[in-house]
Regions:
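Short glycine-rich anion-binding loops that position phosphate/pyrophosphate groups of nucleotides
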Residues: 38-41, 82
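C-terminal functional extensions of proteins
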Residues: 85-191
């Protein structure tokens, strides 16, 4: 499994990740740490794609940053649409019970895709981007700066730029302007 490389490097990588997490939080002193569509490890510390593949070797260990933020009392918000995202550990058992590959996976670790990384606030939505846009809209409204929000037309341009750069729609597996199966027009409308 891809996570075998990580396990072989083990303690050295773990300590470095923890050290960097502390340094980042010390330097930035954030009021909140928000994870959007960010894979979180399961109870075996393996990161999975939604399909159940081990993606640990290509996933930065931001779980340590998130856990350190929680330990310091910094607000953590997790935005997800499946249950493998950081911060969705609040509904880990529900994900294991109700989501394909929630309790099992294709890599053989035996932990499933359900993340064990919890958050203070979990925002579950049909598409993670939409949840993030909702947070941005609330913050912009509170600050009285709605003009900082992007338009539906900008959303379409961003989606097309992603496709032009090679991003696949994960539902169809095709190079088409969709986000999690939803056409660009629907995504623009949400904005």
């Amino acid at each position: 499994a891809a996570s075998d490389v990580y396990k072989r490097q083990g303690d050295k990588l773990v300590e470095e990740a923890k050290k960097q997490a502390a340094e980042i939080l010390d330097r930035l002193n954030p009021k909140a740490v928000i994870a959007v569509e960010r894979p979180g490890w399961n109870d075996k510390h393996v990161h999975h794609s939604g399909m159940g593949y081990d993606i640990s070797s290509v996933t930065a260990k931001l779980d340590y940053l998130y856990e350190e933020a929680r330990a310091r009392g910094i607000l953590t918000i997790g935005v997800g649409d499946l249950g493998n995202e950081m911060g969705m550990g609040n509904v880990e058992e529900e994900v294991k019970a109700g989501i394909p590959n929630g309790a099992t996976c294709l890599c053989g670790c035996g932990g499933g895709i359900a993340t064990s990384v919890k958050s203070d606030v979990g925002l579950i939505c049909n598409i993670s981007n939409w949840g993030a846009y909702g947070i941005c809209a609330c913050l912009a409204a509170l600050a009285g700066e709605e003009e900082v929000l992007h338009s539906g037309e900008m959303e379409k341009r961003m989606i097309r730029a992603c496709v032009d750069a090679g991003a696949l729609d994960p539902v169809s597996g095709m190079l088409i302007p969709r986000v999690d199966g939803e056409p660009e027009e629907i995504n623009a409308y949400i904005i």
